[in-house]
C-alpha cells in the first residue's frame, strides 16, 4: 500500500496531496513569529504583574478580573482549534446544523451568569467538585467527579485540540505532527505553568482579538469567492467530487443543508435531540465545567461576571458565519479534496478513509489567502489552540490540586500545592500526546462529532446532579451518588460499544447493534438524563433529607440565607488550631483563622533557613513556580472567597438585564431564521 501512495508522478495530482506546493512564505512566517513573541510577552507581563504565589492568585487570578477579559477568555477557552477544524468540516460535510451547538451555548453561558453563578458565589466555592462536597457532604461524589473531569479533559479536549491544531501546522509548515505539537506546547506551558489563571486570561483576551480579525477576514474572502450568500446556497448543492461513483449516494450534499432543525428519525442531527438532548451537555459545559466557571469566579464581582458572559454570548453568534459557512465554501472551491467520497482516494488525501471534510478550513486558508494574511490565519489557529489548551491545563491543575491532592495530603503546605499544580500540567501534556493516535484513528471524518458524541455519553448525569442539587433542596448525597453512578455506567456502556462497533463507511452496510445504530447520541443523552433524574429523585425521596448546613447558601432558593457556620472544616484545612506567639495552642474561632499556621513560631523556634546560598538556578525555578520568600509572612486562607457578595449596583443590574433580553432575542431570531 505504501508504494501505491508514493508512485503517482504528476506533480499536482490532488488525491496524493491535499496541499500541493502550498505552505507558508517568509512573510507569513514573519507574521507568525511576531505573534508568538507578542503572546509570550503578554503572558510573561501578566506573570510578573499578578500575584501568583498563593493558591487564589495562581488558580483564580486573584479574583479581580474585569468583564472584558473574562468574556474574551470564556470565548477563547471554548473556541479551540477543534472548533475551526471541526465546525468547518461538519459544515462542509452536512451543512449548518452543527451550528446548533454554538447557538445552544449562547443560552447556556447566560444561564451560568444569571442562575448558577450566584449559587456558587453564595457557597464560596472555587471548584465544581468542592460545590458538591459542600452541598452533599462526603468525599465519594467529589472524588468521582474530579476523576471524571480529568478524563473528559484529556480525551475530548486536550488531545482533540492538539490534534486539530497540529493538522493545520503540519500541512502549512510541513513539519512532523508530533514535532509541531511539542513546539506549541513548549510556548504554551511556559506562561501557563509560570503565570496561572491571570496569564491565561490576559493572553486569551489577546488571542480572541486575533482570532476574530483573522476569521472575519477569511469569511470576507470566502463569500467573495462564491458570490455571497446567494452564491453559497446555489453552488453548495453542486459541489461534488469528480471521482464520486455515479450510482452511489455517498458524497452528495444533504438536501436540508441550510436547515438547523432536521428529520427526527433519519437525519444526522434530529430536531428533538437538538432542542433537548443537546441542551443537557451544553448546560454541563457552560454551567458546571471547571474551565468555564473558573473564569467567571475570577471576576471582580457578579456584575463583571455577567458582563463577561454577555460578551461571550454575543460572540457565540459568530461561529456560524466565521467557521461553518467558510467550511461550506471550501467544499465548493475544492470539491475533489474536501468532498471526496472514494475511501481509497480519501486515504491518500488526508489519511482518513471516512472522509476529508476536516481539511476544509486549512485548505481554504492555504489556497485562498495571500501572503501575510496566510500567516495571520496561522496565528489564529495557533491562538485558538493555545487559548483552549492553557485554559484546560489551568483548570485541570486546579481540580487535581484542590480536590484530589488536598484529599490525599490534607496537611499540604501552600508551597507544596503550588508545585503539585504546576507539575500536574506537565503530566497532562504527556498523557494527552500519548492519546493523540487514538483520536486520529477514531474520529471518522468529522472531528466535532467525535467530541459531541463522547460528551453526550458522559456529561448528562453530571449535569442532572448539579441541576438537582441547585434547584431541589430535598436532593441528598445518596440520591446524587446513585444517580451519578447509574448514569455514568449506562453512558460508559454506550461509549465502549461505539468504540467497538465503529460507524461503517457510506458504501458499506450498517451491521451494528440496534442500541448503537438506531439510537442517536443526542437521543441517548435524553435517555441518560431521564434515568439519572429518576434515580436521584427516587433515592433522595426515600432516604433522609440533607442537613440545613448542606442546603444553606448552596441552592437557588437559599442563596440569600444568613450565614450558617459549619462545624466541619473542608478537607483542605491542614490544622484546626493556631499557635500563638508564645507557642501555646489556641482554638480557632473561624475557618479563616485555621489557615494561619505556624509562621511566627517557625521563624522563631526552628529558624528553617531556606535562604542560605540559594543558587540563581534554584531562585529562577522558585520564581517560575511563584514561590517567593516574602510569601511566608502573608500566607492566605486557602478557602478564601473569590466574589464575596451577590449585591449589584441597581443601574448596572438594569443595563445587564436589558442586554440579556436583547441577546436572547437575537439568538431566537437566528434559530427561527435558519430552523
From Swiss-Prot:
InterPro entries per the UniProt record, alphabetical: Na/Glc_symporter_sf, Na/solute_symporter
**Tissue expression notes:** Highest expression in heart, skeletal muscle, kidney, liver and placenta. Weaker expression in brain, colon, spleen, lung and peripheral blood leukocytes.
Quote the cellular component terms of the Gene Ontology held in the record. Answer: apical plasma membrane; plasma membrane
The keyword Transport belongs to this UniProt entry's keyword annotation: yes
GO BP annotations, alphabetical order: apoptotic process; myo-inositol transport
Chain ranges on the Extracellular side, renumbered to this chain: 1-27, 89-102, 157-180, 230-272, 330-375, 440-446, 501-521
Keyword Nucleotide-binding on entry: no
Assigned keywords, A-Z? Apoptosis, Cell membrane, Ion transport, Membrane, Sodium, Sodium transport, Sugar transport, Symport, Transmembrane, Transmembrane helix, Transport
Give the protein's biological function.
Involved in the sodium-dependent cotransport of myo-inositol (MI) with a Na(+):MI stoichiometry of 2:1. Exclusively responsible for apical MI transport and absorption in intestine. Can also transport D-chiro-inositol (DCI) but not L-fucose. Exhibits stereospecific cotransport of both D-glucose and D-xylose. May induce apoptosis through the TNF-alpha, PDCD1 pathway. May play a role in the regulation of MI concentration in serum, involving reabsorption in at least the proximal tubule of the kidney.
Say which family it is in. Answer: Belongs to the sodium:solute symporter (SSF) (TC 2.A.21) family.
Q: What is this protein called?
A: Sodium/myo-inositol cotransporter 2
Amino acid at each position: 500500500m505504501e508504494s501505491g501512495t508514493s508512485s503517482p508522478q504528476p506533480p499536482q495530482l490532488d488525491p496524493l496531496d491535499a496541499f500541493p506546493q502550498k505552505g507558508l512564505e517568509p512573510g507569513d512566517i514573519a507574521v507568525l513569529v511576531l505573534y508568538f513573541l507578542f503572546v509570550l510577552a503578554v503572558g510573561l507581563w501578566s506573570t510578573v504583574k499578578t500575584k501568583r504565589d498563593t493558591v487564589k492568585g495562581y488558580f483564580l487570578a486573584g479574583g479581580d478580573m474585569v468583564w472584558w477579559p473574562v468574556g474574551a477568555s470564556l470565548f477563547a477557552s471554548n473556541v479551540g482549534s477543534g472548533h475551526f477544524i471541526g465546525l468547518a468540516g461538519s459544515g462542509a460535510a452536512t451543512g449548518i446544523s452543527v451550528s446548533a451547538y454554538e447557538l445552544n451555548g449562547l443560552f447556556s453561558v447566560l444561564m451560568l451568569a444569571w442562575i448558577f453563578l450566584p449559587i456558587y458565589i453564595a457557597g464560596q466555592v472555587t471548584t465544581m467538585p468542592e460545590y458538591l462536597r459542600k452541598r452533599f457532604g462526603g468525599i465519594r461524589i467529589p472524588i468521582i467527579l474530579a476523576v471524571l473531569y480529568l478524563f473528559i479533559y484529556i480525551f475530548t479536549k486536550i488531545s482533540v485540540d492538539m490534534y486539530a491544531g497540529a493538522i493545520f501546522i503540519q500541512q502549512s509548515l510541513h513539519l512532523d505532527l508530533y514535532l509541531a505539537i511539542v513546539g506549541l506546547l513548549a510556548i504554551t506551558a511556559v506562561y501557563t505553568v509560570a503565570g496561572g489563571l491571570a496569564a491565561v486570561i490576559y493572553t486569551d483576551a489577546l488571542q480572541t482579538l486575533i482570532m476574530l480579525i483573522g476569521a472575519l477576514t477569511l469569511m470576507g474572502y470566502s463569500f467573495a469567492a462564491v458570490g455571497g450568500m446567494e452564491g453559497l446556497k446555489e453552488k453548495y448543492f453542486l459541489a461534488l467530487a469528480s471521482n464520486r461513483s455515479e450510482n452511489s449516494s455517498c458524497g452528495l450534499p444533504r438536501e436540508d443543508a441550510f436547515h438547523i432543525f432536521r428529520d427526527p428519525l433519519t437525519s444526522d442531527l434530529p430536531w428533538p435531540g437538538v432542542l433537548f438532548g443537546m441542551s443537557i451537555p451544553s448546560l454541563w459545559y457552560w454551567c458546571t465545567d471547571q474551565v468555564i466557571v473558573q473564569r467567571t469566579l475570577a471576576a471582580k464581582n457578579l456584575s463583571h461576571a455577567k458582563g463577561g458572559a454577555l460578551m461571550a454570548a454575543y460572540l457565540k453568534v459568530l461561529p456560524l458565519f466565521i467557521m461553518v459557512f467558510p467550511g461550506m465554501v471550501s467544499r465548493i472551491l475544492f470539491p475533489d479534496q474536501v468532498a471526496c467520497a472514494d475511501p481509497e482516494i480519501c486515504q491518500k488525501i488526508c489519511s482518513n478513509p471516512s472522509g476529508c471534510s476536516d481539511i476544509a478550513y486549512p485548505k481554504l486558508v492555504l489556497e485562498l489567502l495571500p501572503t501575510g494574511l496566510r500567516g495571520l490565519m496561522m496565528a489564529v489557529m495557533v491562538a485558538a489552540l493555545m487559548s483552549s489548551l492553557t485554559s484546560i491545563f489551568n483548570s485541570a491543575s486546579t481540580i487535581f490540586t484542590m480536590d484530589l491532592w488536598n484529599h490525599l495530603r490534607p496537611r499540604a503546605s501552600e508551597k507544596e500545592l503550588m508545585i503539585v499544580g504546576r507539575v500536574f500540567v506537565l503530566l497532562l501534556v504527556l498523557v494527552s500526546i500519548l492519546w493523540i493516535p487514538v483520536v486520529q484513528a477514531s474520529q471518522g471524518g468529522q472531528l466535532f462529532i467525535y467530541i459531541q458524541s463522547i460528551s453526550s455519553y458522559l456529561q448528562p448525569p453530571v449535569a442532572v446532579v448539579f441541576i438537582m442539587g441547585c434547584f431541589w433542596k430535598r436532593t441528598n448525597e445518596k440520591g446524587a451518588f446513585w444517580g451519578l453512578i447509574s448514569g455514568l455506567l449506562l453512558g460508559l456502556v454506550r461509549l465502549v460499544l461505539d468504540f467497538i462497533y465503529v460507524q461503517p463507511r457510506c458504501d458499506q452496510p450498517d451491521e451494528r447493534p440496534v442500541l448503537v445504530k438506531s439510537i442517536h447520541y443526542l437521543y441517548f443523552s435524553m435517555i441518560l438524563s431521564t434515568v439519572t433524574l429518576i434515580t436521584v429523585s427516587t433515592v433522595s425521596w426515600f432516604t433522609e433529607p440533607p442537613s440545613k448546613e448542606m442546603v444553606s447558601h448552596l441552592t437557588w432558593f437559599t442563596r440569600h440565607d444568613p450565614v450558617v457556620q459549619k462545624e466541619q472544616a473542608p478537607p483542605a484545612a491542614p490544622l484546626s488550631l493556631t499557635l500563638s506567639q508564645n507557642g501555646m495552642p489556641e482554638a480557632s474561632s473561624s475557618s479563616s483563622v485555621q489557615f494561619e499556621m505556624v509562621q511566627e513560631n517557625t521563624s522563631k523556634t526552628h529558624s528553617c533557613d531556606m535562604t542560605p546560598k540559594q543558587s540563581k538556578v534554584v531562585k529562577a525555578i522558585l520564581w517560575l513556580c511563584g514561590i517567593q520568600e516574602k510569601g511566608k509572612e502573608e500566607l492566605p486562607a486557602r478557602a478564601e472567597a473569590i466574589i464575596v457578595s451577590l449585591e449589584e449596583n441597581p443601574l448596572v443590574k438594569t443595563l445587564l438585564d436589558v442586554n440579556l433580553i436583547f441577546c436572547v432575542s437575537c439568538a431566537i431570531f437566528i434559530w427561527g431564521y435558519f430552523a
